């Protein structure tokens, strides 16, 4: 599809929502429906790889080089990375693990 066809097809109808084209002429249709808000600007057939990467990480390791044992924090409970950093600082400074 050349540039003239793209411009003509997106501006030919003033009542419809605009159409945008991304990399490799992927077509993105804008929609006013609520169901389209879950994955905006996502072409059909694409997958969200960040969820796959996050689900494969099961442990967070400590970077404490002074101790011989490596600390592992299981990720079975919901907590933030900041909580893990705080635990690491407490363990390193005062030897306690919350």
From Swiss-Prot:
Deletion phenotype: Reduced sensitivity to abiotic stresses including dehydration and abscisic acid (ABA) treatment. Slightly enhanced pollen tube growth.
GO cellular component, one term: cytoplasm
GO biological process terms held by the UniProt record: abscisic acid-activated signaling pathway; cellular response to abscisic acid stimulus; regulation of pollen tube growth; regulation of proline metabolic process; response to water deprivation
Compartments, as annotated in UniProt: Cytoplasm
Signal peptide as annotated in the record: none
Induction text: Reduced levels in seedlings exposed to abiotic stresses such as mannitol, drought, polyethylene glycol (PEG) and abscisic acid (ABA) treatments.
Protein name from the UniProt record: Protein PROLINE CONTENT ALTERNATIVE 22
Originating organism: Arabidopsis thaliana (Mouse-ear cress)
């Amino acid at each position: 599809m050349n540039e003239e066809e793209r411009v003509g097809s997106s501006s030919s109808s003033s009542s419809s929502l605009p159409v945008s084209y991304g990399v490799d002429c992927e077509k993105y249709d804008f929609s006013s429906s609520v169901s389209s808000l879950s994955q905006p600007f996502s072409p059909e057939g694409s997958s969200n790889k960040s969820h796959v990467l996050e689900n494969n990480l099961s442990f967070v390791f400590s970077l404490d080089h002074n101790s011989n044992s490596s600390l592992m924090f299981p990720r079975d409970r919901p907590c933030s990375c900041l909580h893990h950093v705080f635990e690491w600082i407490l363990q390193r400074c005062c030897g306690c693990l919350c």
